[in-house]
Amino acid sequence: MSNANSFTKEDLVACGLGNLFGPNSPRLPKDNMLMIDRVLKINADGGEFGKGEIVAELDINPDLWFFDCHFAADPVMPGCLGLDAMWQLVGFFLGWEGAEGKGRALGVGEVKFTGQVLPEAKKVTYKLTIKRKVYRKLVMGIADATMEVDGREIYSAKDLKVGIFTDTSSF
């Protein structure tokens, strides 16, 4: 497990290259698909269930790539990108705890969208609480999460599942 409890954008980019937790650790996406600018807090025993929590942020500005293509004359951040960021953070948590392999989203029990991220927004905040960790032949994390834009909760997800696989050839 890493001793660090917060991470910069540079750290997250290093994770995408396999240079943060080690070459065999789960990697974050690179470039435009990395939907996180910083991890403010990560721990292994906090959160509602006492199994870990993560708080992370994404800075919003009108020049972000998705505002140009989603939608013409009606720019809005795709909801699937916020959901993907939540999965990214579950995989990041498992790598932070020392899991090795390739991360894959396995599903989500429930998702609700009650707002949107527009170009004039300033900041998205992700808050995840880990519900369950499985470290057997299959490594898996299950979490509940919310996403806020400028302090207002607009997305919630229950039972986000991410698995870590040493071999993805049959996945």
Swiss-Prot record:
It comes from the Bacteria. It comes from Shewanella piezotolerans (strain WP3 / JCM 13877). GO terms for biological process: unsaturated fatty acid biosynthetic process. Pathway: Lipid metabolism; fatty acid biosynthesis. GO terms for cellular component: cytoplasm. It is found in: Cytoplasm. Keywords: Cytoplasm, Fatty acid biosynthesis, Fatty acid metabolism, Isomerase, Lipid biosynthesis, Lipid metabolism, Lyase. PANTHER family: 3-HYDROXYACYL-[ACYL-CARRIER-PROTEIN] DEHYDRATASE, 3-HYDROXYDECANOYL-[ACYL-CARRIER-PROTEIN] DEHYDRATASE. This is 3-hydroxydecanoyl-[acyl-carrier-protein] dehydratase. Homodimer. The gene is fabA. GO terms for molecular function: (3R)-hydroxyacyl-[acyl-carrier-protein] dehydratase activity; trans-2-decenoyl-acyl-carrier-protein isomerase activity. InterPro entries: FabA, FabA_FabZ, HotDog_dom_sf. It holds the Pfam family FabA.
